[in-house]
């Protein structure tokens, strides 16, 4: 339905409202809850709160670093900085691994199991596939497992939080995408133009052929009519001489009759 919000969105809003009025250890406990909460995979709004940013100056700076890592980082980033960060619970660890899959999916549409096993520091294929299935059920990715070729084929993934410093790169990418679209559009327009020209030439040729066929039909019809008239004329000429010969004896007979009458 239009305007319907997912429970995770409402849950994040509740955490943000709670965070606005807390500080110190209460705020770090709230951050830990957010990082464990099912369905919450974006943290930018929470990071923007002034009291959350103030954690950078105190003894709880590690929690701000951890929140930043969940917003922008991956599981390998956590492993690389593990000594200076709070220990993750099982739920937090799985969520960060889910977010790592999302980051990989944004760059690759077919992710080899070998890459996933390495980045997620997993050795068991069954556990890896279970983790991927969990990510699919949380709607952060859509795809299918190709067990034969050991690939995760990605159809869709959610967007992660964006750093301000990354905005210029995003704008650049969008400009390049627009330029690519314009190039494709120009190519399509040229193909349409060539197709229209081909169609016009084809229609013109077809009209010429039809006109020639019509002329040939007229010529054949006229020739056939002329031949028929000639044949009729020849037949008529052949029939005329016998009639003339029959008339001449009649005249001679009348002359003979006249001579006979005069003698009498």
Curated annotation (Swiss-Prot):
Primary localisation category: cytoplasm
Q: Origin, by domain of life?
A: Eukaryota
GO CC, alphabetical: COP9 signalosome; cytoplasm; cytosol; nucleoplasm; nucleus
Q: What keywords appear on the UniProt entry?
A: Acetylation, Coiled coil, Cytoplasm, Host-virus interaction, Nucleus, Phosphoprotein, Signalosome
> Basic and acidic residues bias located where?
235-248
Q: Which residues form the PCI domain?
A: 2-159
Question: Which InterPro entries does this chain map to?
Answer: COPS7/eIF3m, CSN7_helixI, PCI_dom
The chain residues annotated with the modification N-acetylalanine are: 2
Q: Which family does it belong to?
A: Belongs to the CSN7/EIF3M family. CSN7 subfamily.
The record's subunit annotation is: Component of the CSN complex, composed of COPS1/GPS1, COPS2, COPS3, COPS4, COPS5, COPS6, COPS7 (COPS7A or COPS7B), COPS8 and COPS9 isoform 1. In the complex, it probably interacts directly with COPS1, COPS2, COPS4, COPS5, COPS6 and COPS8. Interacts with EIF3S6. (Microbial infection) Interacts with vaccinia virus protein C9L.
Protein name per the record = COP9 signalosome complex subunit 7b
